[in-house]
Amino acid sequence: FSPDRCCVVVRGERLCAALQHLPYTLSLWGGEEPMSYWAGLSTYPEERGRGFMGALMTHAFTLLCRRGFLLVSLIPAEKSLYDYYGRFGFETAFYCRKYLYEINGVLPASDAVLDNTFDSEWLSGEWCRLTMAYSCRVLHDTDDFDVVRTDVRLAGGDVWTTSVAGTATAVAVVVPRGDSLIILDICADGEMAMVGIISALCRRYSPRRLLLSLPDGSEVGEILPSLLSGIALKSSEREASGMTRIVDAETLLGRYADAYPNRTHTIRLRDDLLPSNSGIYTIKEGRSGKQPLSLSGTDTVCDYDFDVRALTRWLFLEKIDMAPYMSLMLSE
């Protein structure tokens, strides 16, 4: 907790609404961009329906933009809240795929040796290296992994690695639940390393079922039964795992233009909640220029006519091969 990372609404002596904004980094288009993650959004029950949370979010958007954040992300506490946050410009951008396997035989022996004695600095570096194939992902530093390890251990699980000569070949964050083993996050430097750590985990925990979360677009989950005898895929489901909101469209589109210098687009963007985002953007030869809507008129021919949610879908879902991935946010 830090006071400068909280926004609150106080009425008299009552705390009416609050949110906590935490700094993270998002890998995007080959670079890294600042992202604020929101947690603990809440309104005192007797004060709901009075617009306090909406006013609080709008204030926080402006504050975080001034602090240099381009994006704000959150994980709705329940599905019904996706529509609510959508009213404030959030769009579902993060997806994962959940796999359920049944273990119906004896798994083959593996040479993989599980280890949980490493320090978090080494772990965060190895995790970032192993997830570099994910073109858009939320990154975690040493402090994050300190918290993750403490949290999963309190739940009876742990963070496990396999390695060769001091270099991690796989990392898995797991929590046992009944006769199931939940793998909250897993990454490896190849299919066989993935198979090795899963086999070793199953030998350690002896589950009857395996629940595995992977980035949407990863093919490993589908082919895992063909690589590891003794397990059978029972279900596979794509799930929304988070929303994001653009708070600095001008800088973000500049980053996009720099990453794709051969692309040319003209975009009309309207953002009623954050008018500073509105404008006509011209992306050409690695640069992005902006014209205010008031000066460009409504007759300007554009390739795209977006509100902020449509721009988010275009940038994060249509222009990225693998859906953006956000994991280990302590939301499960």
What is the meaning of each model-derived region?
Residues 43, 49-64, 87, 190-202:
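Conserved acetyl-CoA-binding loop-helix of GNAT-fold acetyltransferases
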Residues 88-107, 188, 199-332:
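Active-site/acyl-donor-binding loops of N-acyltransferases
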Residues 57, 64-77, 205-216:
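Conserved GNAT acetyl-CoA-binding A-motif
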Residues 8, 14-24, 37-42, 167-176, ...:
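Conserved beta-strand in the GNAT
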